[in-house]
Amino acid sequence: MTILFLTMVISYFGCMKAAPMKEANVRGQGSLAYPGVRTHGTLESVNGPKAGSRGLTSLADTFEHVIEELLDEDQKVRPSEENNKDADLYTSRVMLSSQVPLEPPLLFLLEEYKNYLDAANMSMRVRRHSDPARRGELSVCDSISEWVTAADKKTAVDMSGGTVTVLEKVPVSKGQLKQYFYETKCNPMGYTKEGCRGIDKRHWNSQCRTTQSYVRALTMDSKKRIGWRFIRIDTSCVCTLTIKRGR
């Protein structure tokens, strides 16, 4: 299914070549621009403000259509809510590839590009003040995200609570591809390992904890049965609070 997603999106990317977006630049945490395009200027500097506006509209419509298609496919592979209430925890964090992916999952990139479009429609002054770095915004918990393989995970817990073996390679028509999982967890070397940032320690006990969600992966159970199952992987770092008593 992942290969189908990538094929579909690549076809959409080919349609974007006619859009007049040749250069773009956004202040903030790096260039959140159209994936795969280097950015060195502004849309206004290419063909004027009106041409830039037309380019943004064209690309926004195209990316919106891509996202809708991906969400439609995502709904098809999810199990019914009647069978499992945790189905809404499914995220597209799995990729089949012959080498380590160099970018976050596609939906993460599309979300970044949507944020870029929103920022591009702002005035320079509003854009500057909306930059989280300028406002002094910090995450409550420090986290890290990285691609891991089945060799790193080895086993996982499925939706029935059983332990399954995560297969490192998936057979395809032209050979085998490795399974990669995009995991997000609390940063053990971060500044929030002793507690959440911004919490009043006089009244609250706080702790940053890694939480998990379900993704679909090729696995083998204890009876040597191989199949696609939903397994738990690390997907976020959240802050948990307990009130201090006896004060």
UniProtKB/Swiss-Prot annotation:
GO terms for cellular component: axon; dendrite; extracellular space; synaptic vesicle. Keywords: Cleavage on pair of basic residues, Disulfide bond, Glycoprotein, Growth factor, Secreted, Signal. Residues 19-128 form a propeptide. GO terms for biological process: cell surface receptor protein tyrosine kinase signaling pathway; modulation of chemical synaptic transmission; negative regulation of neuron apoptotic process; nerve development; nerve growth factor signaling pathway; neuron projection morphogenesis. Its main location: secreted. Residues 1-18 form the signal peptide. One of its GO terms (molecular function) is growth factor activity. It is found in: Secreted. The record marks 57-58 as: Cleavage. Disulfide bonds join 141-208, 186-237, 196-239. Coiled coil: none annotated. The keyword Secreted applies. Glycans are attached at residue 121. Mature BDNF is produced by proteolytic removal of the propeptide, catalyzed by a FURIN family member. In addition, the precursor form is proteolytically cleaved within the propeptide, but this is not an obligatory intermediate for the production of mature BDNF. Can be converted into mature BDNF by plasmin (PLG). Belongs to the NGF-beta family. Important signaling molecule that activates signaling cascades downstream of NTRK2. During development, promotes the survival and differentiation of selected neuronal populations of the peripheral and central nervous systems. Participates in axonal growth, pathfinding and in the modulation of dendritic growth and morphology. Major regulator of synaptic transmission and plasticity at adult synapses in many regions of the CNS. This is Neurotrophic factor BDNF precursor form. It comes from Helarctos malayanus. The lineage of its organism: Eukaryota, Metazoa, Chordata, Craniata, Vertebrata. The gene is BDNF.
